[in-house]
Amino acid sequence: MKIIHIANFYGPKSGGIKTTLHNLGSGYTNRGHDFTYIVPGVGFYQEKTPHGNRITVPSWLIPFSGGYRIIRSNRQIKSILLALSPDRIEISDRFTLSGVGRWARSHKIPTLVFSHETLRGLIKTYQPFSLSKFVRWHNARLAASFDHVVTTTNFAAAEFREIGIDNLMQIPLGVDLATFSPKNRDEELRTKLLKNGDVLRVHCGRLSPEKKPERSIEALRE
């Protein structure tokens, strides 16, 4: 099967989106599928990667975002899709790429969209007020544009369940049990990091507003 995944906000400094794409690609290719992912960049080029074929297309740099980019032309994306004739299309973006879902439906190509976050949470990060009606309208429109909406947590799924959509799929994230295992506990490293303290707390995450890294400190204070 030929699968194409299109994503915004993919780049050298991105975390979750890049990890998702690379793991999806590795999983698909290991099972014999042809996987291509289309991502934003500074120009147009194509390359082979361990995770599949990567096509980079021209994009806009989002000001004050720390380097995030969004794909510039949906028309170019549709031309690429016509040339590659995918069996399935996946999208990781809830804003500028929903039109690709409607286009794919007109070409009888099955689709899904990943909702990696909550729109309500994104708005609260950058705006001091609630836009509940907009959130409900946007999520209903997004769900209607694709055959399936995929979330990984109850938290991300909640705002879709609130509006009663019938094409929601919740697929929990997997865990790399070889890497994240008690067998890897290192008492020497723990002692070194504690520096004669009583509690060692490790925060693994990007220092960006939407990740709310301050919560680790707040939880410890409580």
Labelled PLM ranges:
Residues 52-79, 127, 131:
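A short, charged, and often flexible helix/loop element on the N-terminal side
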